[in-house]
């Protein structure tokens, strides 16, 4: 792929968002009755290609159950308000009514409440009792302190999620999570991400992850682009990660 010069000593390449590309028909058509959008990750089968984002603004226990019954994969945010408060609905309603400037400060106050292990267990067991696939998400930072609680609650799929996650995190304040060792020793499949480049995705796949989440600030719900002014356009990110998967399967 050709590169462009950004400045002296700095080169890059053109990346594309979904709005900048179009999908065109190929030379072969197929009967709609023969088409299936079902998919599978590890031993878990899903009828529709939809994975619920682990965000308080998207996924409550009730929403997760509804999505699971429709055939999708619901993922509950185990660091959200549902694992910090017995009833977070009043806080969510309050945040929704505030202007963006006041909402940010208020959210910081509300999310200062610590994660309660008993609520992590309760929320995941709600999903289990409803008969849907149980998936919960933690950031790498909180995975080391809460993974046992999540596992004991009977999670089916463990999601390790951050704005961007790498297989080789470096930090001086605490021992980084060793993804490869953690995934190897865990008894349930692990999905990790986000990743937005070929190399980062390939390294995550080599840890033994069952799935890799794609994206860095380029999605419709991301605030990274507005806040920091940086993002990876999603069409190119998906294409790069798909290429990494093909090469990983050939290894």
Predicted regions and their residues:
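Active-site entrance/lid segments in N-terminal catalytic domains of soluble metabolic enzymes
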Residues: 1-249
């Amino acid at each position: 792929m050709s590169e462009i010069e950004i400045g002296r000593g700095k080169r890059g390449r053109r990346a594309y968002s979904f709005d900048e590309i179009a999908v065109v028909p190929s030379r072969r058509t197929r009967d709609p009755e023969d088409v299936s959008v079902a998919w599978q990750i590890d031993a878990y089968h899903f009828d529709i290609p939809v994975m619920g984002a682990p965000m308080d603004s998207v996924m409550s226990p009730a929403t997760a159950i509804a999505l699971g019954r429709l055939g999708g994969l619901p993922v509950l945010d185990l660091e959200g308000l549902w694992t910090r408060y017995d009833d977070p609905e009043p806080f969510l309603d309050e945040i929704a009514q505030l202007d963006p400037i006041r909402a940010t400060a208020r959210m910081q106050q509300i999310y200062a409440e610590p994660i309660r292990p008993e609520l992590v267990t309760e929320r995941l067991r709600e999903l289990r009792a409803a008969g849907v696939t149980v998936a919960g998400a933690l950031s790498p930072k909180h995975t080391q302190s809460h993974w046992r609680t999540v596992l004991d609650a009977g999670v089916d799929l463990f999601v390790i999620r951050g704005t961007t996650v790498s297989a080789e995190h470096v930090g001086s304040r605490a021992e980084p999570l060793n993804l490869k060792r953690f995934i190897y020793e865990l008894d349930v499949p692990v999905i990790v991400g986000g990743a937005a480049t070929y190399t980062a995705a390939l390294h995550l796949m080599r840890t033994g992850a069952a799935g890799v989440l794609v994206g860095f600030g380029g999605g419709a719900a991301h605030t990274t682009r507005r806040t920091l002014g940086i993002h990876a356009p999603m069409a190119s990110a998906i294409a790069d990660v798909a290429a990494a998967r093909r090469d990983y399967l050939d290894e």
